[in-house]
Amino acid sequence: MGFKEGDAKKGANLFKTRCAQCHTLGEGEGNKIGPNLHGLFGRHTGSVEGFSYTDANKAKGIEWNKDTLFEYLENPKKYIPGTKMAFGGLKKDKDRNDLITFLQDSTK
């Protein structure tokens, strides 16, 4: 199974409760513990200016899109062994779909 459109409102709540402590969304907002997510879609792993990535993130070499995010967000450490992202992942497909649907609009 892969990405399917979700509920952006539920995704916003997931972002607020599971992601916002480490990530920002807006253009020009700084990095926190994790990188700023503005312009996420179409960007390559390990490429946000001013953020200190692990070699594993830089070497992964994939482009973030709905499908790569869907797989990554299930278990970040499995998808990119060596990442410093401490988040354990979202195991439910629906939660990942909702979050990615929210991120599509909020990271433009």
UniProtKB/Swiss-Prot annotation:
Gene3D superfamilies assigned: Cytochrome c-like domain
InterPro entries attached to this UniProt entry: Cyt_c-like_dom, Cyt_c-like_dom_sf, Cyt_c_1A/1B
GO cellular component, one term: mitochondrial intermembrane space
One family name in Pfam for this protein: Cytochrom_C
Amino-acid positions noted as binding heme c in the UniProt annotation, renumbered to this chain: C19, C22, H23, M85
Keywords linked to the UniProt accession: Electron transport, Heme, Iron, Metal-binding, Mitochondrion, Respiratory chain, Transport
Localization annotation: Mitochondrion intermembrane space
Entries under PROSITE patterns matching the protein: CYTC
Post-translational modifications reported in the UniProt record: Binds 1 heme c group covalently per subunit.
GO molecular function, one term: metal ion binding
The keyword Zinc-finger is assigned to this record: no
PANTHER family per the UniProt record, alphabetical: CYTOCHROME C (PTHR11961)
Family: Belongs to the cytochrome c family.
Reported function: Electron carrier protein. The oxidized form of the cytochrome c heme group can accept an electron from the heme group of the cytochrome c1 subunit of cytochrome reductase. Cytochrome c then transfers this electron to the cytochrome oxidase complex, the final protein carrier in the mitochondrial electron-transport chain.
Name listed for the protein in its UniProt record: Cytochrome c
Organism classification: Eukaryota, Viridiplantae, Streptophyta, Embryophyta, Tracheophyta
